[in-house]
Amino acid sequence: MVKKEINILEELQYINENTPLEKVNDPLLSERKISLFIKREDLNHPHMSGNKWHKLKYNLQKTINKGKNTLLTFGGAYSNHIYAVAAAGKIFNFRTIGIIRGEEHLPLNPTLSFAVENGMKIYYLDRKSYRKKESSEIIKQLQEKFGDFYLLPEGGTNELAVKGCSEIISKIDIDFDYICCPCGTGGTLAGLISGLNGNKFALGFAVLKGASFLKDNVNSLLKNFTYSSFLNWDVNLDYHFGGYSRTNSILLDFVNRFSSITKILVEPIYTGKMLFGIYDLAEKGCFEEGSQIIAVHTGGLQGLKGLTSRTIR
């Protein structure tokens, strides 16, 4: 059973909420007089790394406050979110259920193997049903099967996730012009925008193809959390490389070069696409000379294990 009287932040001793900012020393940027800093959120926890901890922490606290002992959430077979929720369940003694898009494939990939090893119950939902996963019909079926649970949306994105991600801004102690992050559901970007409170500029890089919906998602999250709208942000849709989890030799070569130069490991699904976009926009002169840019490393390095178990397209 879940411990009822618990403060998430006090209990978890191994979270580093003061992750470093590391400057990128790269002639491709310096010759354009652009300064790039990486906010190393990948270093905040071994298994709930990057934006996942920020999205989870207030949702975990609410789960406890409501007296729930089961977390149910959704994700793909290689989901960083599924991985992080399973880890959280193990750490905080929650029962966790992962509703996975698609059919079962054995043996389990590294992401799902980790989830199961950490106590998560895996349940597969065919793709047609998955598209309406948060409908009252599907939720009722899941409640009948698994009993009472705290529902955490796919990707962990809701108003509490926005609250957690907004706190990233308060940990930045240098002046800057832009802050960037990769975008899957828009929760991290909404959090950054909220934390900026109308100052500076936040730029998200969509990792999905056809992600024009992200702007509406972000606006909705902002209105629900801050009751305000902001103009100091945008979502770039040009660097998805064909869609979620898609990549090619150009992106992989860039990621390998970046990691070699900086000694900062990144994956090509989220952070790698954002960084490619930043470099390309810098080359095209889209950032003013002298600009200081912060790129949020959203973790997800567990996904690198999965890349060796599937074909890169």
Question: Where in this protein do the model-derived segments appear?
Answer:
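PLP-dependent amino-acid enzyme catalytic core
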Residues: 1-313
